[in-house]
Amino acid sequence: GGSTFLQRPRFLALSEFGPRSLVYHEGRAYRVVRVRIAPSGHDAMADGSQLPSRSVRICAVCGAAHFDQHSNACHACGVALADAQTISALYRIENVDTEPAERITANDEERQRQAFELQTTFQWNMRNGVPDVRTVGAADAEGDVLRLHYGSGATITRINKGLRRRRDQSVFGFWVNP
C-alpha cells in the first residue's frame, strides 16, 4: 500500500513518530517506515555530504541548551559547561511516512511498543547580550524557599535521544538513510 500523511502536534509527534513506531489515527494503526527529508536536506546532500545537523551542550545543573559552542558558562545558571552533556548530529525531522499496519493483538502491540528517551531543554532569549529573564523569589525565616525564573520568549527544545533500552546509553539518536 501507499504511504499515509498524518499530522500531530510537534511535541507529541517527537515521541510517536520514532522509527518503526505504531501510530493510531482515526481508528487505524500505522507504522512509521521512513523519514521525509526536507528539500534543504536533499540540497545539502547533493554533493555527497551529510544531512545538515547541529550539536548541543546541555547544562548538567539546570538543563539549559547551548547550541552556541563558544560559551564556557551556562547562560541560565552560570555554571561552567565542562560537565555538560554533548549531543552531536541533531537533525530536525519535519515529517515521516507511515504505512497501514497489519492487524496485531494487544499482546503483540505491547511487545512491539518502543519507549524513547526524550529530554526537554530551554534557552533564554537574549536582549543586549543578557538573558531576558525575570526572577522572583519567596523566603521564610530560614531563607529562600522558592526561586522562579520566567522568560517570555524562551525556546523549548525536545530531543529524542533514542530507545531507552539501547545497547550503549552514551550513543544517541537513530541512523537515517535518506
Locate each region found by the language model.
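Accessory interdomain/linker segments of ATP-dependent helicases and helicase-like nucleic-acid enzymes
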Residues: 1-21, 29-32
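Charged, low-complexity interaction segments
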Residues: 1, 14, 53, 57-61, ...
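Inter-lobe coupling/hinge segments of SF2-like helicase ATPases
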Residues: 39-40, 44-60, 67-68
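Hydrophobic beta-strand core residues of beta-sandwich domains
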Residues: 17, 66-67
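Generic detector of short alpha-helix boundary/capping microenvironments
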Residues: 8, 47-50, 139-142
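Short, Lys/Arg- and Gly-enriched loop/turn segments at beta-strand edges
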Residues: 29-42
